[in-house]
Each structure stands twice: as C-alpha cells, then as structure tokens.
Amino acid sequence: MNPISLLFLALAMSTDAFAAALGKGASLHKPRFIEALRTGLIFGAIETITPVIGWGIGQVAARFAESWDHWIAFTLLLVLGLHMIYNGLKHDHEEEQEKPGSHSFWILAVTAFATSIDALAVGVGLAFVDVNIMVAALAIGLATTVMVTIGVMLGRVLGTMVGKRAEIVGGIVLIVVGTTILYEHLTAAA
C-alpha cells in the first residue's frame, strides 16, 4: 500500500470517531484541551489496536468478521446514544450529580471501540494485501487521536450554542454514526 493510500485510509478510519468526538465535546461543559487530548488518546489507542486484531482475524476467517461487525458497532452506538439522550432529558428535571466536564474512561473506551469496529473490518481486509500492519495501525491511531482531539474542541462550540440540550445532541450524533455504519454495510452487501 502506497503512502497516499495509507493516509487516506487513516483519515477515513478516523471519521466515525471524529463525529462521535463532536458529540462528546458538545456534551461536556467547556472541555479543556487536556480533556480533549485524553479523549483523543483513548480513541487513538483503541483505533490502533483494532486493525491489528482484525488483521489477525483476517488471517483466520475474513468472512466471519465481515458478517457481524456492523451490528456490534450499531448496537453499541445506539445504546450509548440512547443513554446520552436519557441523561440529557434527565438533566432537565434533576440537578446534575456528576462532575461537569468529564466522561469516565469506560464510557470513552466503549464509544471508541464502537467507532473502531470498521477499523477491525479494515484490518481483516489488510490481511490480504501487501501492507505493514503496524505502520497502517499506527497511522490510523495517530489520525484518530488528532481528529478526536479536534472534534472534542469543536464540539465545545456546539455545546455552548445548544446549552442544556448538548448531551441530547451528542446522543443523536452517536445514533446517526451507528445507523450510518449499519446502512453502509447493509447496502454494500446488497
């Protein structure tokens, strides 16, 4: 795989995470750069690991992973999105109990995993082409780290504009990302 193709692959793999990061940034109360970078590093690390795992799976059974990856991504993003919408609606009636401006590591990790399912599938495909999987995985992880960090900071602007409804917007973004993943895989299979 040539360097230009690898760059485009890395950027394409980071787009779902970028969209989710916009939602995360919108749901945070004025995230600081360090919070955005922390989120970017979590997403980037997971997005680095999943193509390597996919590549390993591809060495064994490519068709199996391809048949269920989009359903896992859709389900995880749907559940996380609905949870964020619920929390956004709940905040209208109840005082916020959590520390503003933070998301737990596990929420971020599950979201990152859900948005990296496509990278897992790409890793499966990379098992059948001439590519250094470690270079490809590091490129995908670096692009994701940068894109997510930027996405969280841009999401902050969105959060300021929509106020209390920011978490609802973030949940809707996750559901849209999950639905898009499902739609793209189902229409590609048809």
Curated annotation (Swiss-Prot):
Membrane topology per record: Multi-pass membrane protein
GO molecular function: manganese ion transmembrane transporter activity
UniProt keyword Transcription regulation present: no
Transmembrane segments: 3-23, 41-61, 69-89, 105-125, 133-153, 168-188
Record key words, sorted: Cell inner membrane, Cell membrane, Ion transport, Manganese, Membrane, Transmembrane, Transmembrane helix, Transport
Subcellular location per the Swiss-Prot or TrEMBL entry: Cell inner membrane
A GO CC annotation given for this chain: plasma membrane
InterPro entries xref list: Mntp/YtaF, Put_MntP
Stated family: Belongs to the MntP (TC 9.B.29) family.
Stored HAMAP family: MntP_pump
Function: Probably functions as a manganese efflux pump.
Stated name of the protein: Putative manganese efflux pump MntP
Taxonomy of the source species: Bacteria, Pseudomonadati, Pseudomonadota, Gammaproteobacteria, Pseudomonadales
